[in-house]
Amino acid sequence: NPGSDWEFCPSDPRTYEVQFDLYLDALEAMPYGKYLHVGGDEITAIGIDDRCKATGKTAFELQMIWLKNVCQFAVDHGRIPIFWDDMPLKYAGIWELALSDKSEEEVVKVWNTDKLDEAIGLFPKECVYMRWKYEDATTPAHRRLLEWYHDKGLKVMGATAASAGDSPFMPRRNTRSEYVKGFSQLVADNQLEGILATAWDDGSPHLETVWRGFIAQGEFGWNPSARDIEAFKKAHAQREYGFRPEDNRM
């Protein structure tokens, strides 16, 4: 796609020459790392060129072929590949549902993983699927999605956001710490591979607006049930700024 600087042709051998060279740079820069982040999210233009059309494969199949190739590269170089999982969910038609806050009764009526079930053989088992949910991860649909991953024996890591593109610079409600706490509890309950906190610069380029979100991830990632949000805010204000509880400046 000439209009895109972040997408690739999975049927072009030169794609892998470029990507693997970039991956090698990353491995050299981080020689003691455990993972290799391969990306793969938010793709809109795979399968549009003549080379891909000639394969007779769908855009989803082409992307999963790419995923298999880059995962093998990661494994061959002693790393665990991480792939952001939105594209398979979009292919299956459950992406918007997974993001929604629909009730359990509403979700039951429309939940359908048939396409994912049929394509399960395309999902590399050595890959960690980064399940990103920047708002409330405890919704019924999202819980069902985590159950699907578990039932299929796939490895999953959670991703929260200390800042996201749709969140203002200031104020950021509780620095999104309730979302961090909720997802961290799900990670513990479902024995996922781990959790991380992203911070997107389109949400704010200023670190002071996201530090409390990072600290919340450290707090609740280790122990999601130790403190409630108000207790966390008070502890943060005392330790980071020296505020006293009676100051009411949390």
Model-inferred region functions:
Residues 13-28, 32-36, 42, 53-250:
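Substrate-binding groove of N-acetylhexosamine-processing glycoside hydrolases
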Residues 44-50:
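Short acidic/His/Gly/Ser-rich catalytic and metal-binding motifs that mark active-site loops
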Residues 1-14:
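Substrate-binding/active-site clefts of carbohydrate-active enzymes
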